[in-house]
Design a protein with these regions (language model features):
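Catalytic-core regions built around general acid/base machinery
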Residues: 77, 180, 208
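Residues at the C-termini of beta-strands that transition into short coil/loop
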Residues: 143, 190, 213, 219-222
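Residue-level recognition of alpha-helix termini/interfacial anchor residues
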Residues: 133, 176-177, 209
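Active-site segment flanking the S-adenosylmethionine/decSAM binding pocket
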Residues: 87, 93-95, 138-199
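S-adenosyl-L-methionine
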Residues: 1-117, 122-127, 133-138, 149-156, ...
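Short, glycine/charged-enriched secondary-structure capping and boundary segments
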Residues: 103-105, 126-128, 175-178, 201-203
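Short alpha-helix
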Residues: 199-212
Length: 259
């Protein structure tokens, strides 16, 4: 067998393993969702419900969301922001987990969701209606550089902004945009590793941001899954597949606090 053929087989096996893991994560999360009636049982978003078959994004993360541990570092930080920040703005809202959960928790008074996918916006509306927060949530399409013009000034200056837009953060958050958001607390999921010049893009973002904000970082850390009776009959591998958020590498978020 030639080296090229051997390498091809190895790569096919790796892709096959990745596919099998993803498929298993989705199956486990789907099963757990059914058992938990598609309802968050733990954490600050407790009692938030997902409409059946409304998940179009990251379905393998359902279990972590319902257990209140998905992106726990971000979730905990959001819940600790000062109460004067009563507006939540979600860029890359997906199916509304944060947009709706923050309203269900009553941590925020009003929300603004930006989601590029029509299917995503449909899911957000469906889930907002199910959770009876439809009147508190405004839903928009793709977030552009001037997305903040859609937000009343009195809400914008008291806002917390969560940004998860798969690399577009580097094109949207230029110095002018950051200047207009200087009164907000901003959390940015970083995707610099999507780009060959990602380090350069990240350094520029930080350089622009430091004119208006104090910059800190959050990183994915540990989870304790022994506390959930729903997982007591899962084997060790299954529990840790529920814990997995299916990421390509250790995730980092920037937190920007007004100076």
């Amino acid at each position: 067998m030639g080296l090229r053929r051997l390498f091809s087989i190895i790569m096919m096996n790796e892709r096959g393993i990745d596919y099998a893991i993803t498929k298993k994560r989705r199956a486990l999360s789907g099963s757990l969702s059914e058992r938990m009636n598609h309802t968050v049982k733990y954490g600050p978003f407790k009692k938030m419900k997902f409409a059946k078959k409304s998940r179009w994004w990251a379905s393998g993360s359902n279990g972590g969301m319902l257990l209140g541990v998905y992106e726990k570092e971000v979730l905990d930080a959001l819940m600790k922001v000062p109460n004067k920040y009563d507006t939540f703005i979600d860029l890359g809202a997906a199916d509304g987990y944060y947009s709706i959960g923050t309203l269900v928790s009553k941590k925020f008074r009003i929300g603004y969701s930006f989601e590029i996918s029509a299917k995503g916006r449909e899911s957000i509306l469906k889930n907002a209606t199910l959770n009876r927060v439809k009147k508190k949530l405004h839903i928009f399409g793709e977030a552009k550089k001037d997305f903040y013009l859609n937000i009343p000034k009195n809400d914008l200056k008291k806002s917390v902004i969560l940004i998860d837009i798969e690399g577009a953060e580097f094109s949207i958050l230029d110095k002018n945009t950051l200047s207009n958001l200087k009164n907000s607390i901003i959390f940015i999921e970083l995707h610099e590793w999507f780009f060959d010049d990602g380090e350069k893009k990240l350094n520029k973002l930080k350089s622009d941001a430091k004119n208006f904000f104090k910059i800190s970082e959050l990183k994915t850390s540990s989870r304790d899954f022994s506390v959930f009776p729903e997982l007591s009959l899962f084997n060790d591998s299954e529990r840790w597949l529920i814990a997995s958020e299916g990421r390509g590498r250790l995730m980092t978020w920037l937190r920007l606090d007004p100076i």
